[in-house]
Amino acid sequence: MSVIPVVLHRCIVGIALVAGALAIGPAPLRAQQAATVVPGVVVHMDAAPGPDTVVFRRSITRGGVDSITGTRTVVSRVVRGQGGTRLLEIEQRFPGGGGEIVDTALADLGTLRAVAHRSHQPAKTMRFEFVGGAAEGIVSARGPADSARRDEAVHQDLGGPIFDSNVIELVVAALPLKAEFAAELPFFIYERGGRVPMPVAVRERARVAFPVLGEREVWVVTVGVPGAPATIWVDTATRAVLRTRYDITARAMSFTDDRVTPLHG
């Protein structure tokens, strides 16, 4: 999840939910009726009903030098929403902001359309629901010198259904990837006013050697994230995300997450 590093606004990376610990309440479970987020672009995801945990090893590259900075843990599971709607619940835990960031997203399983999002960071907390083509929520930020948090109500018109930027890599893996595939997809980024269209394109199909999983055949997909263009390596056989890289152009650095959890099957 996706996974824009914390140096870029709120580190659009994260999501996994520990059963009951960070449960999203009844309101966000009001998923809208299934319909594709982008007409003509159908996503498909096979998700096990029980929790599934995937660990990525994160490295940072500056000036051609790599350094390991920790891990990103993604936990996903299927839950039932109102009316029996199947929803995908994802939580991500990773270091950032002088502590640990926990991002949780809830999406319609059939379309991956955003339903709700929560981000718990050392300096602030964000909670959003996506209903009726808008994002409604609260951002709570810590004041100077560890003073009390300040709550700000948020309403952002989105112009229709949208994907959560915290699940960029999952959305990419669920696309009908093939040679020359290209589409423009809308993602939610609160700091950029809500709806952010991003070009997504298959660059190539190739065999790539990964540090833990060895050589695999993958789709190499690019995503035009503003200020942090992403490249995502998706296993052609399992559709698992094997690697995600964000290039932070303004800081001449990149973040790379390599999967270390063995592939299923």
What are these regions (language model features)?
Residues M1-H9:
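N-terminal secretory signal peptides that target proteins for export/translocation
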Residues I15, F163, L170-V172, V241, ...:
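A ubiquitous, low-specificity "background" feature that marks scattered single residues
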Residues A27-R30:
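Sec/Tat signal peptide C-region and signal peptidase I cleavage site
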Residues Q32-A134, F181-G265:
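Acidic, serine/threonine-rich low-complexity disordered tracts
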